[in-house]
Amino acid sequence: MKSGFVSILGRPNAGKSTLLNALVGEKVAIVTSKPQTTRNRITGVLEVPAKKKQPAAQIVFVDTPGVHKPGTQLDRRMMQEVYDALEARDIVILLVDASREMKIEETEELAGPAELAESQVSEARPGAPAVAETARKGDWRSEDEFVLNLVRKLDCPVFLAINKIDLIRREQLLPLIDSLMKQFPFAEVLPVSARKRDGLEALVEKLVEYLPTGERYFPPEQFTDQPERFLVAELIRERILMETGEEVPYAAAGVIEKFEEPAAQPAKAKKPRPLKGGGFAEVKLPVTNISAVIYCERDGQKAILIGKGGAKLKAIGTSARKEIESLLGTRVFLELHIIVEPGWRESRGFIDTLDWRKQLEDMAARQADVVGEKLGED
């Protein structure tokens, strides 16, 4: 058997989370059209059955925030998540957006090398190659170079996955692959469409080929290491991203304050009651009670999140509840509150509280305190 960790790296909106969900077959990462949707490392586990000339394998995929030059403390924390994901890995997938690369190529052809070099002066970074040297490298730009500098330091196989091939013409693909191959000695280059699931089988086969021999890291039935509380908070944030615009989605964060699971159901399930006209009455599912806080930075953002007569908050809650019910397999009572936390994106302490790993540590510490108090009373 083979097993190992595969980190998925790329610029914002390359389709990393869509690829992760498609590979795992479960929604473990939220997906929107807005950049910087992913803020944490997201783990997805894929069980690969053995087949002719291929052993069974467990691939632990790690989705990462979009690689970008950090501005706020939140940005820096997101980039730290990227660095951490690159430390514990056996293979790295560098994912690029084929449609974006082709647009860059067309823009460069229209502008010409001189105009392009002039336009990129503001993008130069300390220690980067001269602007004239990097102004035109096939389809490569300084933002891509920033991503590539991360993988140049790695000592593991790096795959180039060219995503969104369904958005470009077939005759454009080979020249694009040739252009991108000039940038780095990638171990493998694979065109894929995460949205349409094209090329994923070939990608998985190649990953298994490169993975080391080893045992499973997770039980076969487990598809992520994220707790349900975090998944629920992310689903709420996904709806905020989709329901609001401008700066509001980026200034919003969700924290689950209460997560009350229904009592354990009896082993013998209740059978549906037959109806007179045929069919069966719907069996009511148990209810999970959830209370969540949405944090934003300004009163104006809070007003937008609430909307006229509370309409926006209701829409966020209704759509999020449906997603959460699908995740949990229960009915859900969802209560949302909004709190203004000025400048939270620059507060390291506050950002720590949003990390689900830190939340689990705090919960464990509180439970230990309660147990200690009870033992002391006895």
Which residues does each PLM region occupy?
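Catalytic P-loop NTPase motifs of RecA-like helicase/translocase cores
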Residues: T38, H68-K69, M102, I168-R169, ...
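Active-site glycine-centered loops adjacent to acidic/histidine catalytic or metal-binding residues
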Residues: D63, N163, S193
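P-loop NTP-binding site
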Residues: E228-D378
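Conserved G1/Walker A P-loop phosphate-binding module
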Residues: M1-E87, V96
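Canonical P-loop GTPase G-domain recognition
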Residues: P157, D166-F223
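Conserved, well-folded catalytic cores of nucleic-acid-processing
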Residues: E26, V45-P49, A85-V92, A98-S99, ...
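Conserved C-terminal guanine-recognition region of P-loop GTPase G domains, centered on the G4
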Residues: A50-P55, R77-A187
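Solvent-exposed alpha-helical segments within well-ordered globular domains of core cellular machineries
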Residues: S7, N21, N40, G44, ...
